């Protein structure tokens, strides 16, 4: 730029040489001048304030220059639409090895920016990415929100860095410092800010959206998060294993060039927390990764990949066209034995794989390993220069955590199944479909023999039983015990989900010492007679400290050869003393079965009694695996809860009503409480009280629960409970017809995507129609908690 002050400004843009975009054939073929020269007269005719005149002149010059550059095509196409979004991508875990560990690798292509929920659900950025052919970023902020206090942990530093090539590299902590990076102190929030100059693409700053195209044109840069130094608890002399930071990505994506590829929104990202991984290869052969066939990772890849069956020559192997990024966030990455020379690739923490068509070992799936995305698209696997050392071949597979992302979709039209609009957020108490893969029988159990169970409540002298306990008054003794090889979590509509957190307040104890966490529970209630019920409780636990117990064992057997095989099971009277070992980190399914005499109240049943010798038991779903050991790798699916349903009545063996929050308020009640205000006007206090405590709905003429509801209310009030709380409990324990209709309609509308306000309004309207009354529910009068 050369000019005199406030006279003329001349800008010359030289475009010598070939453009970075190979698609601009028109500009290469025409014999025109490749230099753009812009002259702007910046002199102002009128006198103005010196500072203001200078600023306005600079802005005017800038606008004119930008306009001329756009006309000449130097800055690329104009954005058609821009979208700001903040994506929550997960957490940064603690460092358990003391070396450099990768915690996250964030790909910035809009169709790949997803959290690891394991579903095809998407947001506005992914939707726009599937509609436009090009994208770029105006800015990018990576926000790290601390999840621990500054004094809670020590010994670890985190680093956020920019990888402009999105290719796995062998980097030490010093190498990461050579990149554009930000070091973050644990316990403090931080933001890693990037500008357009850091994020520009090869086509005048733009990137291609379709991930089936050349890798260097589509992926864009990536953000990597590493930790260094073992994370230690400041309050305990032990390692800290929780999360350190919550990672959020705030940015503005711009799109241009409409080209709909609807199937790009269906790319999957998920996590497999318990998967056994091995690598194999020999000199001159491709590097192969093996995982169990029943693992969540293998099943997802198999379901989402298209494998050719007719294009391979004899003796050759073909692969799927679908590429997957694999990120190993566990410390076990350093323990994985890999044939040379690609040890650095696996220890670096992430790589790319493709499913090998038709190649399966007994119980495993195989994948070719690729050191870059472009190599995966070109089908150039990593070639080994040697084999695994002999002493390492016999090592057991390493159990690790894999976070995997589907990188491309060969077919870009509409998929077989429509994508889901919205999000499924696991919450405490939510019901999951849990697929359990059974392991080998636990000693003293053996194949083709009876399954041993713990019979009495006492243990041999000097030993203790295993108890699943909430507190000293509410616990159950372990009877059945089964080893679980792997656990896969799904939402109630069978969408893959992350594992929930352990159930708070519930733990596995041996002599008052915690040995395991409980992740999911289930109770099966079978009515034997009107006043006699069989209750089987299932507990899915993960052992935190390995242990062994000695118990008196017995087993179930069929009482006679005649009659219903599901209703004549007995327990052998004689017992056998044996030891049972539980391995640290292992999953186990523990059971307890009891007979309850009398009416069954709602809620979780704590009935700790031993198995009775002369009592017939029914074969319910919780006892199926306790008759004979199931073959290894057998899978069973249970619908389980992640919190304990609270009891609503007092009695022997049940949880008493001694807490302030007996029931968590349901969604409908919570919404109604939220819309109440202190400015509501009632006609009289008496009318308000009469309306508030009217638990007998006169519109429900066929309400069979009326007597029970009134009886429970009177009992609770006589025990000293307030009328408000007693009414609330009674209405929930024995809901009226109107209550049931409201709740059913409300939950159905919420699932379909309606807002809470609209859902509750429609639910009230349906309840009024069913009751035959016209009685305002939320408008014009106070919304009462029903």
Swiss-Prot record:
Effect caused by changing residue 659 to I: In strain: Oxford
Q: What is the effect of changing residue 292 to S?
A: In strain: Oxford
The record places the site described as Cleavage at: 313-314, 393-394, 423-424, 648-649, 657-658
- Residue ranges with Basic residues bias: 19-29
Taxonomically, the superkingdom here is: Viruses
Q: Where is this region: Acidic?
A: 649-786
Q: Give positions of region: Basic.
A: 1-70
Q: Where is this region: Core attachment?
A: 394-423
Biological process per Gene Ontology, one example term: clathrin-dependent endocytosis of virus by host cell
Bias (Polar residues) occurs at: 1-13
- Which terms are listed as keywords in the entry? Capsid protein, Clathrin-mediated endocytosis of virus by host, T=3 icosahedral capsid protein, Viral penetration into host cytoplasm, Virion, Virus endocytosis by host, Virus entry into host cell
Q: Does the keyword Zinc apply?
A: no
Q: Where is this region: Inner core?
A: 71-263
Region annotation Disordered: where it falls in the sequence: 1-60, 648-668
Q: Which GO terms describe its cellular component?
A: host extracellular space; T=3 icosahedral viral capsid
Outcome, altering residue 521 to V: In strain: Oxford
**Spans annotated as P2 globular domain:** 424-648
Name the InterPro entries for this protein. Answer: Astro_capsid_N, Astro_capsid_p, Viral_coat
The observed outcome of changing residue 440 to S is: In strain: Oxford
Mutation effect (residue 512 to I): In strain: Oxford
Miscellaneous information on this protein: The sequence shown is that of isolate Newcastle.
Protein family membership: Belongs to the astroviridae capsid polyprotein family.
Protein name (record): Capsid polyprotein VP90
